Amino acid sequence: MWIKNISLKHYRNYEEAQVDFSPNLNIFIGRNAQGKTNFLEAIYFLALTRSHRTRSDKELVHFKHHDVQITGEVIRKSGHLNLDIQLSEKGRITKVNHLKQAKLSDYIGAMTVVLFAPEDLQLVKGAPSLRRKFLDIDIGQIKPTYLAELSNYNHVLKQRNTYLKTTNNVDKTFLTVLDEQLADYGSRVIEHRFDFIQALNDEADKHHYIISTELEHLSIHYKSSIEFTDKSSIREHFLNQLSKSHSRDIFKKNTSIGPHRDDITFFINDINATFASQGQQRSLILSLKLAEIELIKTVTNDYPILLLDDVMSELDNHRQLKLLEGIKENVQTFITTTSLEHLSALPDQLKIFNVSDGTISINEKKATD
């Protein structure tokens, strides 16, 4: 899979931009605060209908305007797709091949992406919500039903929490009805996550073993707030533990267990990776990203698009080499950087773009078809 071109209208500091890409490597070079990250964010947004930097769509709109449009042509093994996202004060419209998509789960997955940004280094030591977001984005791209089930779970969770916060005399019968619905959707969310982590663990360990020059093994554990013995019993245990938590939940006025409380833990040679060195943690995240690429390829039969936002300078030559070896010619890759000096072992087939104050121009001397 690769994105052939993109058109931006009123996106961040871009009033208008149209760019044709190389199917291999695309490098965006320029000083800080010129729009390099904004451009990669636009590709990410076109794929996932969300930014990795902000929850507010208003921040994506050029200061002179009130609407945004991003369009792109994607080439897949199954054919060409035209993607279109429009944001306005009236709301959001997503289209695939000019047809409106009623549900988020109908749109996401048309173009798959893997993002590697500086904030990803917080996946090891950061808040559990970062790791849950990582799971939700990855699983959502390869299993559309996951997004629907997660959305339903969050809807019932919000109902349950609102009821607990606003009701002085809780009706246990009504609470049990909400428990049933929460356990239905939540158990499926946990099952999807559990399966994904098992597959990710196997693939990431292979990459980490190579990157660490065969010195380290990586393992990833799903840490559920629900105690269960096997996948078939998740719903039963979830429902039972929800019932047991009624008194606590009524007192605290929120739902204390469920996938919204879950986490993942990383181990290097059986030692919690929060105690690992910065170099080891960088290798871990790099291994995760390479594993994401392979898992998406396995499920969808198409390689995802790789977005490397200002991370090459964070990697030494050894890790850069392993990253570029891992993607080879199969993965269309976008790199932002302030200088080419940080980059090593670049392939012959690439395009280099200059970015300056919301304007993109091709570097003719260094671009190849």
UniProtKB/Swiss-Prot annotation:
The cellular location(s) given in this protein's UniProt record come to:
Cytoplasm
GO biological processes: DNA replication; DNA synthesis involved in DNA repair; double-strand break repair; SOS response
One Pfam entry name: SMC_N
The domain of life for this entry's organism is Bacteria
The residues that hold ATP are G30, R31, N32, A33, Q34, G35, K36, T37
GO CC terms on record? Answer: cytoplasm
Q: Which InterPro entries match?
A: DNA-binding_RecF (IPR001238), DNA-binding_RecF_CS (IPR018078), P-loop_NTPase (IPR027417), RecF/RecN/SMC_N (IPR003395), RecF_2 (IPR042174)
The record's section on HAMAP family has: RecF (MF_00365)
In the record, the note on similarity to other proteins reads: Belongs to the RecF family.
Q: What does this protein do?
A: The RecF protein is involved in DNA metabolism; it is required for DNA replication and normal SOS inducibility. RecF binds preferentially to single-stranded, linear DNA. It also seems to bind ATP.
Identification of the protein by name? DNA replication and repair protein RecF
Give the originating organism. Streptococcus agalactiae serotype V (strain ATCC BAA-611 / 2603 V/R)
